[in-house]
Amino acid sequence: MEMNTRIQVEHTVTEEVIDHDLIKEQIKIAAGEKIGKKNYIPMMHAMECRINAEDVFNNFRPTPGTITSFHSPKGHGVRVDTHVYSGYTVSPHYDSMIAKLICRAQTREECIKKMRRALDEFIIDGVKTTIPFHRKLMDDESFQKGKFHTGFLETFNMKDEPKSEKKEKVK
């Protein structure tokens, strides 16, 4: 039997739909406390966009460099997990992840709408990011209807700019 003692990368989405801090719960259990009696039934819709320093128009090639401007979106149902700031240098030697953008809403449609707005408000200058990819994905009709599969991205067209595209500034 295998035991995974780590929390999964996508735990943020689970936390948002059940409205509970899984990291806090995991620490309590490790300290010998009993698992909480919270109702863990999903009550919301949530999705996460991993914002990486990558060039989506060049096969997602990493784009190390210095972030010259960083402004994350805010608002009800919008969460940004990051360690990055203006002046931060994205190294070519490590993971290119800049932030996890998580949005939560009552319905999938509302969640997509909120994610579009949050992506439009997210400002990262100095390196190319995956923000244009996520904007384009939010505009895709198949994605909006939940009609996608594991091979979906192989046929996804990134050549055209997304409707809500804001030009990225790379110096």
What are these regions (language model features)?
Residues 1-171:
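ATP-dependent carboxylate activation and anion-phosphoryl transfer catalytic cores
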